[in-house]
Amino acid sequence: MATQRLPRIAFLPGEGVGPEVVAQARRVLCALRGPGFDFEALDAPANAVGALATDAWGEPLPPATLALAQSADAVLFGSVGDPRHDHLPVHLRPERAILGLRRGLGLYASLRHIAITGPLETANLPTSMPGQ
């Protein structure tokens, strides 16, 4: 019987608050390890994406970073962006890394968790349906 491969998670911290957020999310994932849950971590270098990648490699999403993400089952992505790069042509700005990842992974949107509380919970529910 073949052993099943562990799910692979690529960690791309980026810059700004990204490294802090990804580090804490990783701590949570590591704390959850046990029977029934484990993973293989794929660590990208600190300058693998965003402004740091543009500074080091001349582009916000180097091919090696995209290849790492494509080899993973999931990507934990921090953040990118640096106002010092606002003068660059659009294709070299750090934020282009997000679009490159979406395109390279066949995705169309970023998922962001939100919580709706209080009066907003029912704010978008119609009080009557059209035609009734």
Label every PLM stretch briefly.
Residues R26-L29:
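Short, solvent-exposed amphipathic alpha-helical segments in soluble enzyme
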Residues L42:
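The conserved SAM/SAH-binding core of class I Rossmann-like methyltransferase domains
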Residues A2-P19, A23, G34-D38, A46-Q132:
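Anion-binding alpha/beta catalytic cores of soluble intermediary-metabolism enzymes, centered on
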